[in-house]
Amino acid sequence: LEPFDRGTNLLTATNALPDIPVSRRLDEPNNETTAKTDNIDFKIEHKLSDGWKLNAGYSYARYKYFYDQARITNVNVKTRTARRTIEQQQGDQRVHSGTLNIVGEFGIGDIANRFVAGIDAMRNIRDLGPIYNQGIMNSDINIDNPNYTSPVAEHKNGNGNAYQYNYLKTVGIYIQDTAYFTDNFIMTGGLRYEYFDQFAGRHCLNAANCKKGQNLTKTGNTDQHDGKLLYQLGAVYKFTPHIATFANYSESFRPQMSVATPVSGDLKPEQGKSFEIGAKYENSGFNATLALFNISKRNVAETVGSGSNAQLNIVGKQRSRGVEFDLNGQITD
């Protein structure tokens, strides 16, 4: 366990450091940040025949953290004092995911094929809280001769954010086939249907903290489910063993959520389409790729306003396009 030290404080008015040793702590030596991560992962492969096999997998991840700190909010070089906020927070996230697919290699006439079909599922459970961040110390600390008192966070929270949560479940079903028409020309295509169910929101600490419009029980700012069929298509043509051109088209579907910010209307999933075309050169010494891309998204969420007036809105479409160049090589042995 290491003491959590944020270091010295930057004076925002002058963009300079206070005239004290940089090693001097203005928070508290008992600041604490701890985290624990557990991971379980296993895969099974079963050969059905010479050209077919069955794959299955499961993974579990858990992440827990806790922090307790005195956070510097202001340094007054004239009075030689620093003001700090005493905060405490903990969180727990668990992710279960599993997959099952079948892979087959076969020929249709002179065309070799690699076929994949499967299903995957994921459950993500994230709980944050309790969060105590309402306590400012009554007395400031002297920056020249600090007296560390090991303060404890006051167990109160009056803004309705003491507990935050996001529960997400997804299921995907997919098929994909890669066809080798010749040694030089390869095409791949696939379909994927993805479904999600999501609940996210917040509530306050207890009845005494709940103000008008705040919730003591779990009520979601986001409570939704949806699904969509997605397409993917790609092609590669090799002019020589070292030079190839390629083109790819794909679609995306991503659920969005709001924990603390009210949502204006329905928070629809973000959807995207991307297209890329380019050329690639590769030999034993280096490889280079030049590509043009175009990415468009719709149902993009954006926070409008601030503080108590903040609201999450769907702002419409976004588009990005450009040129990408990548070069990798081995300079020496």
Summary of predicted features, one role per range:
Residues 64, 112, 116-240, 262:
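Signature of Gram-negative outer-membrane beta-barrel scaffolds
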Residues 25-30, 39, 43, 83-89, ...:
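Extracellular loop and loop/strand-boundary signature of outer-membrane beta-barrel proteins
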Residues 2-17, 36, 67-73, 128-134, ...:
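Outer-membrane beta-barrel translocator domains and adjoining extracellular loop/strand segments
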Residues 43-59, 63-69, 238, 245-246, ...:
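Membrane-embedded beta-barrel scaffold of Gram-negative outer-membrane proteins
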Residues 1-47, 60-93, 136-166, 170:
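Acidic/polar loop-and-plug regions of large Gram-negative outer-membrane beta-barrel proteins
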